Regions:
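Charged substrate- and nucleic-acid-binding regions of tRNA-handling and nucleotidyl-transfer enzymes
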Residues: 424-485
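Structural motif
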Residues: 15, 261-269, 305-311, 349-359, ...
Length: 486
């Protein structure tokens, strides 16, 4: 068992690519096989080393180590396609020598005209074979005109290419709908379908698991395997990932790259857990899986044919589950970049800053599903003025206009002014003393204090909120509570 993940380094590492890598990786680990990382960088105009580094870093962050390939090495390298061009030339020359491929001098304009003519007649566009039997005189004429040939594979007529897909079952294609297709471009670079076949064969790949969009490439690749007399690997084409509107996932659906989710403060184990469930249905009702549990549970026969829907709410639900296991210190580090982003954390932190920010993060632990969400809850600590929560102004004013509210707030303000130190335990004792002094309990004490200090009816632990606001800010807000009742 040998599988590969072979991304093109042409942009941010897409979440769909991460899922393809994961299914390959899980199968390799389940079957005690080999997982290869290969880089398909023949798109010279768009491929960058920066993108390649992002792919590698993302895989490592997700915990998907590879056994062979880029940086790791192996017996079947090089593992970048641009470093394998000499190998490709040898195979190309073999096909030319055996008459299984030929040079094509047709210009893009000529090909477009043929394609349009076929479409006008209601035919499926394919190459018309114009250059299949060119004589040497015509070739010389084309070369003199400055034409540079592509290389096309001869595809047999009236042949059926069929295979048993590991996900979709029996699939077949007719060769007459394929036509002789280009395998090497005019610049000498092999096209995707040709390079991938050579790489998979030379690297001993036995199982190819990839996105459904590659299904239409399979008959062309099978034609190349046949022309070279090579064994065809087993194919499995996994379902597309759609947004909640059932359209192909794109930027309009939110973050689409692994790096974006990392920067937003999602946990790698949560993202892996979520990606595994995008198109794979485990036995039973369990939805949370450790890496080892995923390896043990994974099987190709439980991959779905139908598109998988990327549900951000489900990802948040899963990430929230994993965040519960973080220590306060780990949660602080997860949220810190986002607290710096809103100016609540200085670039250089002293111990007092760290203690305050750690308490802040732990206070809102049950209110956030990912690190960046902390930004939605910290506004009440950033200014002197309290604003009543939008849409709830009337009920909030009603709390402050309760007959007992001024008594409670006055007692709390006086007690707070006497304190030398504010901690959650000290605040708890202070509120308890206010209850005793006013002979009031429960919401008649907690609610006016919370509304006066935060402008909200509900929220996290009030003792922590008071501690985080600090004495001076609390006194200022209590002294100006009258503005909220108008």
């Amino acid at each position: 068992m040998k599988v590969r993940f072979a991304p093109s380094p042409t942009g941010p590492f897409h979440i769909g690519g991460a899922r393809s890598a994961l299914f390959n990786w899980l199968l390799a680990r389940k079957e005690k096989g080999t997982f290869v990382l290969r880089i398909e960088d023949t798109d010279l105009a768009r491929s960058t080393r920066e993108s390649e580094e992002n792919i590698k870093a993302s895989l490592q962050w997700l915990g998907m180590n590879w056994d062979e390939g880029i940086d790791v090495g192996g017996n079947n390298g090089p593992y970048r396609q641009t470093e394998r061009l000499d190998l490709y030339k040898e195979v190309t020359q073999r096909l030319l020598d055996e008459g299984k491929a030929y040079e094509c001098y047709c210009t893009p304009e000529e090909l477009d005209a043929v394609r349009q003519d076929q479409m006008d007649r209601g035919e499926t566009p394919k190459y018309n074979g114009h250059c299949e039997h060119l004589d040497e005189e015509t070739k010389a004429k084309y070369i003199a005109e400055g034409r540079k040939p592509t290389i096309r594979l001869r595809v047999p007529l009236n042949k059926t290419y069929s295979f048993d897909d590991m996900v979709r079952g029996h699939v077949s294609f007719e060769s007459n709908g394929v036509g002789d297709f280009v395998i090497v471009k005019s610049d000498g670079i092999p096209v995707y379908n040709f390079a991938v076949v050579m790489d998979d064969h030379m690297m001993g790949i036995t199982h190819v698991i990839r996105a459904e969009e590659h299904l239409s490439n399979t008959p062309r690749q099978m034609a190349i395997y046949e022309a070279l007399g090579w064994e065809v690997p087993k194919f499995g084409h996994i379902s597309l990932i759609l947004g909640k509107d059932y359209k192909k996932m794109s930027k309009r659906h939110g973050a689409t790259s692994v790096e974006q989710y990392k920067q937003l403060g999602y946990l790698p184990e949560a993202l892996v857990n979520f990606l595994a469930l995008l198109g794979w249905a485990p036995e039973g009702e369990e939805e949370f899986f450790t890496q080892d549990e995923l390896i043990q549970a994974f099987s190709m026969d439980r991959l779905a044919k139908n598109p998988a829907v990327f549900d951000i709410d489900k990802l948040n639900h899963i990430n929230f589950h994993y965040m519960k296991n973080l220590s306060d210190e780990e949660l602080f580090h997860l949220c810190l970049p986002h607290l710096k982003e809103v100016g609540l954390a200085p670039d250089s932190l002293n111990q007092a800053d760290i203690d305050w920010l750690t308490l802040l993060c732990s206070t809102f632990r049950d209110h956030i599903s990912y690190g960046a969400q902390i930004k939605e809850h910290v506004g009440l600590f950033m200014g002197e003025t309290v604003f009543l929560e939008e849409g709830h102004e009337e009920e909030l004013r009603a709390v402050l206009n309760e007959e007992t509210a001024p008594t409670v707030l006055g007692a709390f303000r006086n007690a707070l002014a006497e304190l030398d130190e504010i901690t959650p335990d000290v605040v708890k004792a202070t509120i308890k003393a206010v209850m005793k002094e006013t002979s009031l309990k429960g919401k008649f004490v907690f609610m006016p204090i919370r509304v006066a200090l935060t402008g909200q009816m509900h929220g996290p632990d009030l003792n922590n909120i008071v501690t985080l606001l600090g004495k001076e800010k609390c006194l200022h807000r209590l002294d100006n509570v009258g503005a909220l009742t108008k």
